[in-house]
Amino acid sequence: VALIAGGVGITPIRALLEDMPGAPGDIAVVYRSARAAEVILRDELDELAARRGAEIHYLIGEPRSPSGDDLRALVPDIADRHVYVCGSTEMTRATRATLRRDGVPAAQITTEGFSL
């Protein structure tokens, strides 16, 4: 499983990290925030990831063009995972397109987009 969050989209992703079944190493979290000061729940996420044996990656800064290079570098087997994405509508749309280009079947992608 891969959990991908943008900004405050980490809130539902955090709940999935806590409750989702999986053995150590089965869950990867990728959390993008425009600025380091805007990363929320970091201590809690780090503790949960350590307890669950999950990988967690923080990407700080505005994303460049939607490219899967960074994502594949962080989660090389992304095409074999079910991917949950939560963030702005624009972010979830771009991430879904990137995942599809990277070979993730549509049935393995679940998104929740929102606008503020």
Predicted segments, located by residue:
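FNR/FR-type flavoprotein reductase catalytic core
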Residues: 1-116
